[in-house]
């Protein structure tokens, strides 16, 4: 393994109250090397420069601790995980988590399975599938303490994909840019319909950077109606908005 300067990431994580062991640091470095290697064969990320990956992928993923700190034995699902952000990074930092990494592209699942094996991680699985299908009863529905997502979608759409996975009393956390705060008002109807309630929207800057981020935290207060999520494509084409209206009726008829 090549030698890397770890001072910056260690300082960044200290700002979040996270201290990594030598083993965890080694896992993150190996994760980085695998990401770059596999990215040469398939498009996993546009960000491959070492310091950028540390800041924009690893540190950003672990910023979850700004709003909550998962405990040992908690079950977490990452919807639309891509190359494993934030879910795999959270698993490394919090090894007691039980993590499911969900993505619709099989090539990403191949990378994730290779990374899980190489990093020697337990209680983590990569699942090839769509949120609309995996949220069916008897699979992942309402079986998780936390659902996280950095997927690029509006908050109403993400809520429909993610809230069905969260058990009552659990949390859905959406990783958004500084523009995420503007989506919150439009998404509150969707949150309510899906059994959620906005807990907080936290804006911050990643340590030693000008990168503005927003974590939107939604608490699951009641079960999601069985008709959600709707069939593939509808949550993004016709997101739940405003009052019970034309868009929602069209999508569920």
Predicted regions and their residues:
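SAM/dcSAM-binding transferase cores
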Residues: 185-253
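Conserved beta-strand signature within the Rossmann-like core of class I S-adenosyl-L-methionine
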Residues: 169-182
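Conserved SAM/SAH cofactor-binding pocket of Class I
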Residues: 62-153, 159-160
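Class I SAM-dependent transferase core
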Residues: 1-77, 107-110, 114-124
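Short alpha-helix immediately C-terminal to the canonical SAM-binding loop
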Residues: 108-110, 180, 184
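Residue-level signal for inorganic ion chemistry
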Residues: 35, 90, 176, 218
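Short loop/edge segments at beta-strand edges and connector loops
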Residues: 48, 128-130, 200-202
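Helix-to-beta-strand junctions that scaffold the AdoMet/dcAdoMet cofactor pocket
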Residues: 94, 166-168
